[in-house]
């Protein structure tokens, strides 16, 4: 069983890498490769450190929902992490001439459907959390670019490593024009992601656990079990629709997801 000292040491290792932008060794030497409870405890500790600096929770992200990304990461199940206000860089391409790479360690980018919740998802029992329930809780769907990142050197991760590292979260960009679910069916969307005009990733809604709304249901169950249910106003990044890809300073990334506005993000040093 993982000790509190080992959990604390893992939190400190990842927090230092996050603050210095210098990648660290994996934390599986401290928490093992099978102790998910310990991995999520490390994640909680890492998030609490950010909250202590004034950041606040705005939602959740679901990771490793597509087979392509699971293969890229070498994992076989999804996970989740927290979204903080400081991760939102939706306006930086327009306001600052690009998103600074100095905030990142080893970033990759992926396109996905995000959901803005209009209702809490906290029914009397876990069995009540159905796709129909979470669909009803969604206010709007929006296109998203997630800039995933790993504080662990060379992305040398097992499942517990990525969970501990807040599900390899980094930054995100979301569209300004939301679409109600009466106008778009998430599982049917098609996605193309280009870098400097060249397609680098493609996929569809069915690649995300069969349906992004199924991914949302899965997340709602996990949050319910952890005693921290999804709430009205939360943003949920539901998971990649295709493989994630690396990018560099000076790159222009565009994501086209059918039924949504095209998203553009530019990156600088």
What do the predicted segments below correspond to?
Residues 227-234:
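Beta-rich strand-turn-strand
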Residues 32, 221-223, 238-240:
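Short alpha-helix capping/helix-loop boundary micro-motifs
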Residues 237-238, 255:
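A generic structural signal for residues embedded in beta-strands
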């Amino acid at each position: 069983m993982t000790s509190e000292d080992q959990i604390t040491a893992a939190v400190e290792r990842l927090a230092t890498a996050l603050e210095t932008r210098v990648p660290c060794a994996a934390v599986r030497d401290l928490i093992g490769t099978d102790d998910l409870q310990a991995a999520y405890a490390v994640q909680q500790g890492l998030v609490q450190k950010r909250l202590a600096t004034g950041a606040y929770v705005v939602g959740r992200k679901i990771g490793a929902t597509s087979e392509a990304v699971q293969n890229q990461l070498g994992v076989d199940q999804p996970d989740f992490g927290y979204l903080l206000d400081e991760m939102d860089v939706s306006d930086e391409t327009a306001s600052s001439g690009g998103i600074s790479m100095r905030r990142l360690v080893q970033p990759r980018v992926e396109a996905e459907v995000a959901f803005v919740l209009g209702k809490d998802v906290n029914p009397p029992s876990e069995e009540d959390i159905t796709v129909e329930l979470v669909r009803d809780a969604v206010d709007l769907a929006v296109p998203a670019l997630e800039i995933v990142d790993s504080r662990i050197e060379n992305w040398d991760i097992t499942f517990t490593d990525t969970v501990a590292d807040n599900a390899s979260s980094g930054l995100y960009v979301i569209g300004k024009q939301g679409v109600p679910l009466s106008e778009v069916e998430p599982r049917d969307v098609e996605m193309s992601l280009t870098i400097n005009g060249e397609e680098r990733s493609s996929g569809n809604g069915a690649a995300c656990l069969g349906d992004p709304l199924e991914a949302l249901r899965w997340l709602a169950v996990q949050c319910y079990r952890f005693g921290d249910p999804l709430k009205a106003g939360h943003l949920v990044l539901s998971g990649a629709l295709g493989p994630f890809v690396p990018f560099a300073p000076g790159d222009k990334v565009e994501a086209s997801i059918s039924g949504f506005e095209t998203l553009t993000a530019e990156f600088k040093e």
